[in-house]
């Protein structure tokens, strides 16, 4: 009987942790309401209000996630006045417990700890009290801000479902300003109410955000509201003539005879050596620091760092102009000017301006290798094939067996042919020849052939072609794609065995 109970327990636990639907049936928490309000005042100031009502459904919501038991509010005392309008917990029995005064704590945000220029920014921590199953946390606050310019991209998603999400922009009735907005609906329930001075967006029944790896950009997955109003600060204008004499020595140290490599070295220097203070630009009035300020302080926002890259490129003699996702840099190849797009948020390879973003990455390598694999037990040795620059980087260990979210992949066409010379003594044989060749409709093809030649060498052919629309693997295609990635990774190792009775020479 005891054995039957143990088996039943194991089966029950397996079904709970392996079911793709278990999260749907056991949410940790749920937002009844999220409301963001932007009210422009006649004196040129703005009131930014936020209200949330979140119901805690499981113990995990209380103990495992700091963002449920605590709320973090970023503000800049130099331009903002923060007011907590309401903060309380509604217990399961309906009683209200007000958040005590000692539960409001101001601190320096972690984003600003390594950047003295932004040490004036503060983070108000609200520690919610009286938390229990089925309680509802209510928080309502307003930030009164000097300045009325607004440029926000709001992705309407949280880490638990939202019953109702509202975005409101309210201008004075006699204002000459207008509200600019774009809304990405997707398959979600969204209603828009507007007149000449008011914009009101209501989204209902929003699911929680995906936690999968290799996700596409958030704005392509979830409903997104882009809103703007007011006069754009002049500081945001592109500084097309800004140079940086203070960085001339650094620029010289990064020099390379290949101009594109030289430009990339400058970008990489900024990414590696300038600390990122990653907070919303609205905290500093949408103003960017000069390239000199960012360089000398060793820190800046992503927008500051982009401006710095452009200025350092100009100091090095390149033509450089900023754009949304990086810098256009002009180099000379064979005497001809060529413009490349250089990302400034990560170390992506430079891309020729005008080339398709999802163009296939083509690799065709054929070369001889000398066996370089350790002993893995007894008379066996194992070698992992090299990872070539630019090759596909999808780790199947992060690909769950069931997936509902689309997967972002860079289309590729990779071909590798290796001939591996084995140790001369003793004689070695390939443990397991591999011969895989198949085509997955709408995804691509895979071919892996590992065999031993009559000469004793190991012959390896690996070919992978991924060609999916817009670089997106759909949930319907996912199972076949995952299998391709598993095979591509699994058969990247070659195992050999020494002839029986003869020891392996060396380690």
What does each model-identified segment do?
Residues 14-24:
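C-terminal segment of classical bacterial N-terminal signal peptides
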Residues 26-507:
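A sensor for short, sequence-defined functional sites
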């Amino acid at each position: 009987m005891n054995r039957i109970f143990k088996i039943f327990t194991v089966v029950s636990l397996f079904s709970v942790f392996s079911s793709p639907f278990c999260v749907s049936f056991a949410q940790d928490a749920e937002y009844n309401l999220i409301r963001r309000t932007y009210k422009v005042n006649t004196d040129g100031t703005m009131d930014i209000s936020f209200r949330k009502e979140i119901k805690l459904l499981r113990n995990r919501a209380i103990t495992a996630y700091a963002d449920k038991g605590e709320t973090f509010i970023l503000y800049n005392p130099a331009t903002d006045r923060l007011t907590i309008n309401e903060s309380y917990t509604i217990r399961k029995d309906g009683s209200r417990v007000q958040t005590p005064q000692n539960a409001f704590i101001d601190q320096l945000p972690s984003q600003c700890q390594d950047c003295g220029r932004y040490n004036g920014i503060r983070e108000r921590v609200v520690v919610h009290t009286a938390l229990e199953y089925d309680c509802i946390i209510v928080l309502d606050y307003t930030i009164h801000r000097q300045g009325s310019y607004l440029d926000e991209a709001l992705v309407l998603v949280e880490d638990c479902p939202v019953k109702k999400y509202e975005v409101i922009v309210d201008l004075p009735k006699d204002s000459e300003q207008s509200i600019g907005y774009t809304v990405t609906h997707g398959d979600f329930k969204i209603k828009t109410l507007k007149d000449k001075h008011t914009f009101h967006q209501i989204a209902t029944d929003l699911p929680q955000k995906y936690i999968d790896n290799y996700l596409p950009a958030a704005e392509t997955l979830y409903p997104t509201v882009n809103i703007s109003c007011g006069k754009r600060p002049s500081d945001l204008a592109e500084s097309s003539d800004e140079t940086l004499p203070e960085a001339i020595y650094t620029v010289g140290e990064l020099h390379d005879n290949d101009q594109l490599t030289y430009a990339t070295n400058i970008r990489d220097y900024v990414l590696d050596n300038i600390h990122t203070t990653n907070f919303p630009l609205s905290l500093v009035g949408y103003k960017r620091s000069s390239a000199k300020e960012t360089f000398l302080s060793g820190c800046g926002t992503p927008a500051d760092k982009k401006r710095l890259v452009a200025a350092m490129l100009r100091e090095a003699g390149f033509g450089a102009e900023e754009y949304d996702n990086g810098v256009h840099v002009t180099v000379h190849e064979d005497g001809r000017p060529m413009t490349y797009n250089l990302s400034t948020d990560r170390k992506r390879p430079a891309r020729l301006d005008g080339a398709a973003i999802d163009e296939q990455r083509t690799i065709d390598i054929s070369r001889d290798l000398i066996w370089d694999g350790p002993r893995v037990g007894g008379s066996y040795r194992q070698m992992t094939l090299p990872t070539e620059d630019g090759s596909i980087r999808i780790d199947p260990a992060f690909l769950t067996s069931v997936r509902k979210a689309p997967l972002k992949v860079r289309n590729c066409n990779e071909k590798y042919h290796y001939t591996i010379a084995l140790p001369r003594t003793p004689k070695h044989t390939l443990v397991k020849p591999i011969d895989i060749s198949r085509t997955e409709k709408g995804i691509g093809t895979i071919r892996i052939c590992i065999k031993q030649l009559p000469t004793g060498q190991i012959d390896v052919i690996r070919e992978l072609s991924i060609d999916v629309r817009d670089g997106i693997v759909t949930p319907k295609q996912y199972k076949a794609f995952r299998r391709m990635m598993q095979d591509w990774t699994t058969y990247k190792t070659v195992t050999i065995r020494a002839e029986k009775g003869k020891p392996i020479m060396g380690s």
